[in-house]
Amino acid sequence: MAGAGLLEIKRRIKSIKNTRKITKAMGLVATSKLRKARQKLTENNQYFSSLDEIARELIGSLNSNNNPLLKPNDNPKKLIILLASDSGLCGGFNGNTAAFVRDNYENNLENIEAVVVGKKGIHYVKKNKISTLAEYVDLGDTPNVGDASTIVNKAVKEFTDGNFGEVSLVYTKFFSPVKQEVVEEKLLPLDLTGEKGKVSFLIEPDEDEIIDSLVSSYLKGKFMNAMFNSKASEQSARMQAMDGATKNADDLLNSLDAKYNRIRQSIITQEISEIVGGAEAQK
């Protein structure tokens, strides 16, 4: 029986070692992707910070307020664009975003609909009984303007058609490799209140046309910034999850190695005792 126990332990050790190779490799890949994602996020933060400053100064200095995306409506319904991931094995990254919506709107879910970005987020949104309006999957590791435009245009149409009174973004903001936080930011109606009189602008020939173009660029820029934050947070969560899995595998291997050695030592001791006992009996 002890010999059978050794074989079972050896089988488990082999299986865990194979799994450890996978988690270790995935952790290294996530670390590499995180490094690239952080670089792209840093660059995008600089761009969006400048865009935000310009937009607020320009809108704040103009008298025109004809753009419908700057005006609220009375519809109580809210559209939430929820950023998740297409791939799993990233800890609570996807579950936390859906749980955030549930916890903050549990008494008003009948007025909430979601646009889900990321295949893995769909399961958690439905699990938390949140209605979905649209789903976007397989967008890739690097956010691009084409995808951002498609999703933003969908939200804009829903808002301008009066189907929703507010559109917001729920995503995981990246602060550091060990700190990410689910946040909600209002997207529509757009609030670009600036300090009036700080900067003077002379716009010709059409002020409304400039505002329309600026608002469109701002919405896409804000959404892209959220996507870059989400991607960096996803890779950080996956890196931590795989590092944790690798450490757990190491701990389990150490425990199994110790157990294997104890059983093996017990078998050897028993065999020696039997040999010695047999020799004594023959005297």
From Swiss-Prot:
Q: Keywords assigned by UniProt?
A: ATP synthesis, Cell membrane, CF(1), Hydrogen ion transport, Ion transport, Membrane, Transport
Q: Which domain of life is it from?
A: Bacteria
Q: What is the lineage of its organism?
A: Bacteria, Bacillati, Bacillota, Clostridia, Eubacteriales
What quaternary structure, including any partners, is listed in this protein's UniProt entry? Answer: F-type ATPases have 2 components, CF(1) - the catalytic core - and CF(0) - the membrane proton channel. CF(1) has five subunits: alpha(3), beta(3), gamma(1), delta(1), epsilon(1). CF(0) has three main subunits: a, b and c.
Query: What does it do?
Result: Produces ATP from ADP in the presence of a proton gradient across the membrane. The gamma chain is believed to be important in regulating ATPase activity and the flow of protons through the CF(0) complex.
Tell me its family: Belongs to the ATPase gamma chain family.
Give the species this sequence originates from. Clostridium perfringens (strain 13 / Type A)
User: How does the UniProt record describe the way this protein sits in the membrane?
Assistant: Peripheral membrane protein
Q: Which Pfam families match?
A: ATP-synt
Q: Where in the cell is it found?
A: Cell membrane
- Protein name stated in the entry: ATP synthase gamma chain
Q: Which GO terms describe its biological process?
A: proton motive force-driven plasma membrane ATP synthesis
Q: Which InterPro entries match?
A: ATP_synth_F1_ATPase_gsu (IPR035968), ATP_synth_F1_gsu (IPR000131), ATP_synth_F1_gsu_CS (IPR023632)
MF (Gene Ontology) = ATP binding; proton-transporting ATP synthase activity, rotational mechanism
Q: Name one GO cellular component term.
A: plasma membrane
Q: Could you tell me which PROSITE patterns the record lists for this protein?
A: ATPASE_GAMMA
Work out whether the entry's keyword set contains Transport: yes
